[in-house]
Amino acid sequence: MERGVVESRAPQHLQKAPSKKPHDKTAEEAAEQIEGVVKIVTCFDVPQIKFPTAGHPWSTDPHHQDVADRLLLTSRVRFYGDDIAAVVAESEVAAAQALRALRVEYEEYPFVLDVQEAMKPDAPLLHEEFPNNILAHTTIRNGNYEEASREPGLIKVEGWYDTPTVQHCHIENHMCFASMEAGRIVIYSSTQIPHIVRRVVGQALGIPWGKVRVVKPYIGGGFGNKQDALYEPLCAYLSTVVGGRLVKLDCTREETFVCNRVRHAIRTHIISWVRPDGTFAARKIECFSNQGAYASHGHGIVAKGMGAFPQLYPCPNVDGDAYTVFTNRPAAGAMRGYGIPQAMFAGESHIEDVCRVLGVDSLEYRRKHMMPVGFVDGFSKNENHSDTLNQVLDKGEAWMDYSRKHREYENQTGPVRRGVGCALFWYNTAVWPISLESCSCRMVLNQDGSIQLQTGETEIGQGCDTAFAQMAADAVGIPVSDVHVVTAQDTDVTPFGTGAYASRQTYVGGFAIAQTGALLKERILKYACELTRQMPALLDIVDFGKITTYA
């Protein structure tokens, strides 16, 4: 059985329990006298260094860097899950007793939970540097929406579409361990982004990144929640203030809901000006993303979602506005699909509204008006080379027996009815062209002819290690059983990789593995040439690891 992070360190550790209360200022009352309590740290004791938490590669362009708005502990509570003090103790019981003994004095502030309310001029500001609580606003301006919408004979279809906040609910809650060894901080964490966590911890503590080592063991899921540096910086800091002893921090399920990350709730407004034949003359989209109290991944989610709007049903005249807005809710971050599920729900719901207004079958409407082969995206310049959208519609129609059920369910009455429907979904892997992509790979040839494979792209349950092993075996010419993938990542020895996100590991990591495998194969055959005195072009690795000559 694979070892989870909770089993991966010695049981001699300190417990850390963060104090969370729903208001403001703190006033510490001594609780160190409780047996087992080692240290109490408040927001007035920690370094006042703001740092970002999002799991994005570091950019040298200040305008392309994540917003640094977090402190290890804060005196300004912006949502229920903010940490204002921490107790380090020998046991969870002692830590909980100390938290109950603390007395905190608060000043209540007005709060705002709704995006539209938060954008009003008189709304309370969560961050003074962001007027109207708007973290970011981006636009799409394709063609001339205003002029195109005045074309005679157009039909206006308009709707508002809402998606809620949800939490990832991975089986394993987030946890981490931190200690000091030889003057360096060592962290074991259930994270998707070990190399990025190393950098964020260095930033938060104001120390060189090389003074931090992060190990990611086999973990129990993440789905984007663990694409943030959640509690590793605080855990590392607490270890430094107790003499480098091993400190453990793990979240309860309630804390995971409140204090980790959630999916952005997004409200979308779409207006389509449609010709009687179903073609679009002009379209407009407005997206309002509820960011919660802190930036985390911020505007990237709704910007990516809105960016997917013009492609699925091309229209020459599109206006788009996306807003990411702070509210006093839990901070929203990455979650599977990264804004695309919200965008697809809104867009496909709107297509159903269009079909209802026009009185046409929605399946046939999609076939006629969806992205064609040869379509070139104006932003990424990517071209659609395949007709797979039509293929999946055909397969879905056959599998569901869609046409028969659609006729059968047409004229139902009564409180309980059956329905059948269809929707399209498209998603692009990786983060280009917003960011550059990179991946590193190391292959070591063992004495028995097997290879050890290391990469910085993390396995979190999605199966990328299996794909990596298959790719490596194919590239070198050996059986998959002879490829040993090192599942754990250790920033001291693992090649650099940005981690698990954007459905990118197999796609991006595959290039690094293919190139590394080709290089290893070349070196193996070069050595074989020296032994056999054969020309390199006459040798190959075939039949699962056998070197053969074609002479």
State the predicted function of each range.
Residues 1-10, 169-174, 318-329, 437, ...:
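Flexible hinge/switch segments at interdomain interfaces of large molecular machines
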Residues 1-131, 159:
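Flexible, low-hydrophobicity surface segments
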Residues 13-47, 84-106, 175-243, 300-310, ...:
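Alpha-helical support elements that line or immediately flank enzyme active sites
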Residues 41-82, 117-118, 123-127, 196, ...:
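Short, surface-exposed loop/turn segments at secondary-structure boundaries that line and modulate
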Residues 57, 119-205, 369-450:
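Helix-loop-helix junctions that connect adjacent transmembrane helices in secondary transporters/permeases
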Residues 60-67, 132-176, 265-349, 428-438, ...:
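Glycine-rich loop/linker segments at domain edges
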Residues 76, 168, 177, 269-273, ...:
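Short, surface-exposed charged micro-motifs
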Residues 110-116, 360-369, 403-415, 480-484, ...:
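Flexible, glycine/charged-enriched surface loops at secondary-structure junctions
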